[in-house]
């Protein structure tokens, strides 16, 4: 067990599916597509990344010591994230991960493509021009209003 301040006991994270582990990794502060991809490359599966011991994570050489600490602390949010994951369907939101059959092909050529998308509604066909509003899950009230305004204007314009 790590004795550094702020790092709590390491729980037994071994019952998650690959998809659940990936969803949780997408929520770790500072983890983007590149970091998650490098970790998966080193460990083989998202489950192995999620359940890795601190020494294994450090040895992988992907994360700085500070980011290892952030990751270990973030794993304590697992149950909240899983509750959110299983609540998405009720709100009409789909979690689409790279590799899923409905992940947009138009993103595949890009190196910095999103690892996952949260989609409400239907995605357009790959040949159809489209606009997406991308933002933070914890945006300000102004951010919500601005996104809503632009989404409405674009929809009214037939985009």
For every predicted segment, state its role:
Residues 4-152, 156:
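Short, positively charged patches
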Residues 159:
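Acidic/polar, glycine-anchored loop/turn motif associated with catalytic or activation segments
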